[in-house]
């Protein structure tokens, strides 16, 4: 009995992993997406490395966040751009979201802006798949599995080329999940990307959702048709990307305290909140800021790594609003310092966001509604003022607003008064704090931490060389078989045939029964005349 007591004190996640066991020392190839997408993947990669796995991260030689690390080996490949060009493109991508446009032109502007980054990713992928030295290195290393972000499908193509079981880390997609994961997605209650609808839609919203679902197929083709050409050249056969997306496992950064409930497949594992690391001690600098805030506490403000500066007029409006509240504002901002910045607002180029949100003095979180920030807000129970800018951020903000955990502002149209009122609302109205604390409690009430769960399933795929028993047979069906159109057509043909036979039989019977009598009567009349 005494032997069991120390084990009982171990973290549940650690015990779970130890009990299941793992063949340590497997070789994992990681094909990440640069930028904020890398942050969640990095946490998983580091934990896998700590468990003894040999990890190689494939990176373009010019990148933003894919730096050296003691946890993995980097294998770089050449790309046709330099660091200044890369930074300029990302800076342009972030800053363009503050440009006003008409509602009719907004979708086109969003598409063109997204293509700034998507084209850069394509150039990177093209260089990789045409670099014979890198491909030779990958073939020779005999990896056990491939771990990738499928938003840009270079890793998907490599998994097919190297014949490796693959694991996808995924949060959102310009096209809905069913297009690549074969997961059912009823348009009646599963809102499509960019619609900003909830799961309770009015008839006009369901109509718009239905149309958006149709347009997603066209969008998918526009975004990824070039990758199909790359894949066909590399694999020496005609391929389609949906056919290549037959991975072993999806690690979805989902948690249904945040997402709307929807159907899923057995090879989909939910790991929302992996980026909510254990809160560490604040540095002396930030500890001093927090302590100086007094009873009013702090507000954390960050619009993410993609936004480096804000137009001067808008920045001054924001600064004016922040100066009207009693809290201390910690604003992550690398642009020009607003001339009207108040004494209660501190500009920093970087801040320990999760650690600050986890401090008892955190009163509110001003965020662009990126999924990483949303989950950190949920984990730490901090109500939010949301200023979504692009991508899935509008939908994320709608989800939190629907749950009563935050207020959404249109960053292009809001005034200083709007921001001031929103901050005072989420800070002073207790319902927002109560709602976010309830979400936090639900999120944390689980048998294993999402990071431990992600590590387990990556090891599971490496240990068993894939997970084909979890793969839905829907991947093997044509579109008309998936929707049973051939069965419906066959049954319809039978019904129509039966109806036709019955109709003809009745017509023939009527002619026999009534047609003969008519002729007899007619013949009788002619004889009497």
Curated annotation (Swiss-Prot):
List where the protein spans the membrane: 487-503
Q: Which GO terms describe its molecular function?
A: enzyme binding; glucuronosyltransferase activity; protein homodimerization activity; protein-containing complex binding
Question: Keywords assigned by UniProt?
Answer: Endoplasmic reticulum, Glycoprotein, Glycosyltransferase, Membrane, Microsome, Phosphoprotein, Signal, Transferase, Transmembrane, Transmembrane helix
Superkingdom of the organism of origin: Eukaryota
Q: State which Enzyme Commission number(s) the record gives.
A: 2.4.1.17
Name the species this protein comes from. Answer: Rattus norvegicus
InterPro entries for the chain: UDP-glycosyltransferase, UDP_glucos_trans, UDP_glycos_trans_CS
Q: Which residues carry this modification: Phosphoserine?
A: 76
Tell me which GO cellular component terms the UniProt record holds: endoplasmic reticulum; endoplasmic reticulum membrane; protein-containing complex
Cellular compartments annotated: Microsome; Endoplasmic reticulum membrane
List of glycosylated residues: 281, 291, 429
Major localisation: other
The molecule here is called UDP-glucuronosyltransferase 1A6
Give the protein's biological function. Answer: UDP-glucuronosyltransferase (UGT) that catalyzes phase II biotransformation reactions in which lipophilic substrates are conjugated with glucuronic acid to facilitate their inactivation and excretion from the body. Essential for the elimination and detoxification of drugs, xenobiotics and endogenous compounds. Involved in the glucuronidation of arachidonic acid (AA) and AA-derived eicosanoids including 15-HETE and 20-HETE. Conjugates small planar phenolic molecules such as 4-nitrophenol, 1-naphthol, and 4-methylumbelliferone.
Q: Which family does it belong to?
A: Belongs to the UDP-glycosyltransferase family.
Bilayer disposition of the protein: Single-pass membrane protein
Gene Ontology process terms (BP): 4-chlorobiphenyl metabolic process; cellular response to glucocorticoid stimulus; cellular response to hormone stimulus; liver development; response to 3-methylcholanthrene; response to Aroclor 1254; response to lipopolysaccharide; response to peptide hormone
| UniProt lineage | Eukaryota, Metazoa, Chordata, Craniata, Vertebrata
Instruction: Show the catalytic activity.
Output: glucuronate acceptor + UDP-alpha-D-glucuronate = acceptor beta-D-glucuronoside + UDP + H(+); (5Z,8Z,11Z,14Z)-eicosatetraenoate + UDP-alpha-D-glucuronate = O-[(5Z),(8Z),(11Z),(14Z)-eicosatetraenoyl]-beta-D-glucuronate + UDP; 15-hydroxy-(5Z,8Z,11Z,13E)-eicosatetraenoate + UDP-alpha-D-glucuronate = 15-O-(beta-D-glucuronosyl)-(5Z,8Z,11Z,14Z)-eicosatetraenoate + UDP + H(+); (E)-ferulate + UDP-alpha-D-glucuronate = (E)-4-O-(beta-D-glucuronosyl)-ferulate + UDP + H(+)
Q: Which Gene3D superfamilies does the record match to this protein?
A: Glycogen Phosphorylase B (3.40.50.2000)
Q: List the signal peptide residues.
A: 1-25
Does the entry feature the keyword Glycosyltransferase, yes or no?
yes
């Amino acid at each position: 009995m005494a032997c069991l007591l120390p084990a009982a004190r171990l973290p549940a996640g650690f015990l779970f992993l130890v009990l299941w066991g793992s063949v340590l020392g497997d070789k994992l190839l990681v094909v990440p997406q640069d930028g904020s997408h890398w942050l969640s993947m990095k946490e998983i990669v580091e934990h896998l490395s700590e468990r003894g796995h040999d990890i190689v991260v494939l990176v373009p030689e010019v990148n933003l966040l894919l730096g050296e690390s003691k946890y993995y080996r980097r294998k770089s490949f050449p790309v046709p751009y330099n660091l200044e060009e890369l930074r300029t493109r990302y800076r342009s991508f972030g800053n363009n979201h503050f440009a006003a446009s008409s509602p009719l032109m907004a979708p086109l502007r969003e598409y063109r802006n997204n293509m700034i980054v998507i084209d850069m990713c394509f150039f990177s992928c093209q260089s990789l798949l045409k670099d014979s030295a890198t491909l030779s290195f990958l073939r020779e290393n005999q990896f056990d599995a491939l771990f990738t972000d499928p938003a840009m499908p270079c890793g998907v193509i490599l998994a097919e080329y190297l014949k490796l079981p693959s694991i996808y880390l995924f949060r959102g997609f310009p096209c809905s999940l069913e297009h690549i994961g074969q997961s059912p997605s009823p348009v009646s209650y599963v809102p499509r990307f960019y619609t900003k609808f909830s799961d309770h839609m009015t008839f006009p919203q369901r109509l718009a959702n239905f149309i958006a679902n149709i347009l997603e197929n066209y969008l998918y083709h526009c975004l990824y048709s070039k990758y199909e050409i790359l894949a066909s050249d590399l694999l020496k056969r005609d391929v389609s990307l949906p056919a290549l997306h037959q991975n072993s496992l999806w690690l979805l950064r989902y948690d249904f305290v945040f997402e709307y409930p929807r159907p899923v497949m057995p090879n989909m594992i939910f790991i929302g909140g992996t980026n909510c690391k254990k809160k560490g001690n604040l540095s002396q600098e930030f500890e001093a800021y927090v302590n100086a805030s007094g009873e009013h506490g702090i507000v954390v403000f960050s619009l993410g790594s993609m936004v480096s500066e804000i137009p001067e007029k808008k920045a001054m409006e924001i600064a004016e609003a922040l100066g009207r509240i009693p809290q201390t504002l910690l604003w992550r901002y690398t642009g020009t310092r607003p001339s009207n910045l108040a004494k209660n607002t501190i500009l920093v180029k970087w801040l320990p966001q999760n650690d600050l949100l986890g401090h008892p003095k955190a009163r509110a979180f001003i965020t662009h509604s990126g999924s990483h920030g949303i989950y950190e807000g949920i984990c730490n129970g901090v109500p939010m003022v949301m200023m979504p800018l692009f991508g899935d951020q509008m939908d994320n903000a709608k989800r939190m607003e629907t749950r009563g955990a935050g207020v959404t502002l249109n960053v292009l149209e809001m005034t200083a008064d709007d921001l001031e009122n929103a901050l005072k609302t989420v800070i002073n109205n207790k319902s927002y704090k109560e709602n976010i604390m309830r979400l936090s409690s639900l999120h944390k009430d689980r048998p294993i931490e999402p990071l431990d769960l992600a590590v387990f399933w990556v090891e599971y795929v490496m240990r068993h060389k894939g997970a084909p028993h979890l793969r839905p047979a829907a991947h093997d069906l044509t579109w008309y078989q998936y929707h049973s159109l051939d069965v419906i057509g066959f049954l319809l043909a039978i019904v129509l045939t039966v109806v036709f036979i019955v109709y003809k039989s009745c017509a023939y019977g009527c002619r026999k029964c009534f047609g003969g009598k008519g002729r007899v009567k007619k013949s009788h009349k002619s004889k009497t005349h």
